[in-house]
């Protein structure tokens, strides 16, 4: 199966310029994807383009990841409604280094093979290019009429937009077009890929190559990923789902994929994993037979978490999930680091308790009625303790008068109380 066929069955092609498939079948081809370096981590919205590059390299072709150091200083107006913050060079260089480390989990940069991946930064060829030379050499080839016809420009200049568009952002498509021309000349790059919102910018590049060099270059875009309910993919109430554990813990990352709908899981497993058609068909059959077991979501969450983080992080995330949603032990709870513990119990009631009072020792029954409103009365707590329905840190509480002190704390700060099977409370010593 060639690259285009692979993307087709995965639902990853929106538009493709005529001649693209023939070019790829003819010879080893270099293709690039542009990556916005405005943060020092990729988020899952970037993953579609990254997976395209991964499939491209697996098909024997040469992937190029272009970090938009120069264009990132401006901001792409495509489908955006406001001007972007501009970044300084030191920040962009730091972001580039972080992004390359993440990309190395998907692409082989170190191989001696002719299709080894390469990372480039357009700031390296734009920083010495004077404005006068640029508008003389490049600007003369693309008319304002051509640039105004792009959907992203029309949208920002429409009456509905109160923001308007600066000359800086208007010039963005010329800069991206020049990137393609530069890579065509210096890296033999014949294909640019991206999301459907990039079609206008990509075709500006193919047009520039045609007009300046008489060369043939191609374009391929993937659909913008949406959710079945029409919501925005990759966003939660707390913001983006990042690939860097500093911003999104492996547990939260795993939970995001585990909780997608059946319809989304069937779509995402083709786009965000390397699983074959046969493997996915088998999972779909399992899902149809026993949807309550959610085999698609579980496999999707496993594959993406292992790919982005590690097998160990995936296993820890599963174990952490079992603490809240299944049967787990005191030992499993002790293994959780503080970030994962807080992520797991983010949605349960929290109570602050005095560290000094706890250090002196407090009876469990007083702690759960007077210091934290877990039980409305001591009598009710006694009744549930007698039937084995109360646990502290996943250990059954045998007596309501058991004295709790600082030695019971997790990470010297937290105490987890469970009332019945499903009610959890997190006490925080302060």
UniProtKB/Swiss-Prot annotation:
Catalyzes the attachment of tyrosine to tRNA(Tyr) in a two-step reaction: tyrosine is first activated by ATP to form Tyr-AMP and then transferred to the acceptor end of tRNA(Tyr). The keyword Nucleotide-binding applies. L-tyrosine binds at residues 32, 172, 176. Belongs to the class-I aminoacyl-tRNA synthetase family. TyrS type 1 subfamily. Gene3D superfamilies: HUPs, RNA-binding S4 domain, Tyrosyl-Transfer RNA Synthetase. Signal peptide: none annotated. The lineage of its organism: Bacteria, Pseudomonadati, Bacteroidota, Bacteroidia, Bacteroidales. It comes from Parabacteroides distasonis (strain ATCC 8503 / DSM 20701 / CIP 104284 / JCM 5825 / NCTC 11152). ATP binds at residue 235. InterPro entries: aa-tRNA-synth_I_CS, aa-tRNA-synth_Ic, Rossmann-like_a/b/a_fold, S4_RNA-bd_sf, SYY-like_C, Tyr-tRNA-ligase, Tyr-tRNA-ligase_bac-type, Tyr-tRNA-ligase_bac_1. A motif ('KMSKS' region) lies at residues 232-236. The keyword Metal-binding does not apply. It is found in: Cytoplasm. Residues 362-429 form the S4 RNA-binding domain. This is Tyrosine--tRNA ligase. PROSITE patterns: AA_TRNA_LIGASE_I, S4. A motif ('HIGH' region) lies at residues 37-46. GO terms for molecular function: ATP binding; RNA binding; tyrosine-tRNA ligase activity. It holds the Pfam family SYY_C-terminal. Its EC number is 6.1.1.1. Its main location: cytoplasm.
């Amino acid at each position: 199966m060639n690259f285009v066929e692979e993307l087709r069955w995965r639902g990853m092609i929106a538009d493709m310029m005529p001649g693209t498939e023939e070019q790829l079948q003819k010879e080893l081809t270099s293709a690039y994807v542009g990556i916005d370096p405005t943060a020092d981590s990729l988020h899952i919205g970037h993953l579609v383009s990254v997976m395209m590059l991964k499939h491209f390299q697996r098909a024997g072709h040469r992937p190029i990841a272009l970090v938009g150091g120069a264009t990132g200083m401006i901001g792409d107006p495509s489908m955006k409604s406001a001007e972007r913050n501009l970044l300084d060079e030191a920040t962009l260089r730091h972001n580039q280094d972080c992004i390359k480390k993440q990309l190395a989990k998907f692409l082989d940069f170190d191989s001696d093979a002719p299709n080894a991946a390469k990372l480039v930064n357009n700031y390296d060829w734009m920083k010495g290019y004077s404005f006068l030379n640029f508008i003389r050499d490049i600007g003369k080839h693309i008319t304002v009429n051509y640039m105004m016809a792009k959907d992203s420009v029309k949208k920002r200049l429409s009456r509905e937009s109160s923001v308007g568009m600066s000359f800086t952002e208007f010039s963005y498509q010329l800069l991206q077009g020049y990137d393609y021309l530069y890579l065509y000349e210096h890296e033999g790059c014949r294909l640019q890929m991206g999301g459907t919102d990039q079609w206008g910018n990509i075709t500006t590049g193919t047009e520039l190559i045609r007009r300046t060099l008489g060369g043939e270059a191609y374009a391929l875009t993937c659909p913008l990923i949406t959710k079945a309910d029409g919501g925005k993919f990759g966003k939660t109430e707390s913001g983006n789902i990042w690939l860097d554990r500093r911003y999104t813990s492996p547990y939260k990352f795993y939970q995001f994929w585990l909780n997608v709908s059946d319809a989304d899981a069937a779509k995402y497993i083709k786009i965000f994993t390397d699983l074959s058609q046969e493997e996915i068909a088998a999972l779909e059959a399992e899902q149809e037979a026993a949807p309550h077991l959610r085999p698609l979501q579980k496999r999707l969450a496993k594959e993406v978490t292992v790919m982005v983080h590690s097998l160990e992080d995936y296993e820890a995330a599963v174990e952490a999930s079992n603490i809240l949603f299944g049967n787990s032990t005191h030992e499993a709870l002790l293994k959780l680091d503080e970030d994962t513990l807080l992520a797991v119990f983010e949605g349960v009631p929290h109570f602050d308790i005095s560290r000094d009072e706890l250090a002196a020792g407090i009876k469990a029954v007083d702690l759960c009625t007077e210091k934290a409103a877990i039980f409305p009365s001591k009598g009710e707590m006694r009744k549930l303790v007698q039937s084995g329905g109360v646990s502290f840190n996943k250990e059954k509480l045998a007596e309501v008068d058991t004295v709790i002190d600082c030695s019971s704390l997790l990470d010297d700060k937290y105490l987890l109380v469970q009332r019945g099977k499903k009610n959890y409370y997190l006490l925080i010593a302060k």
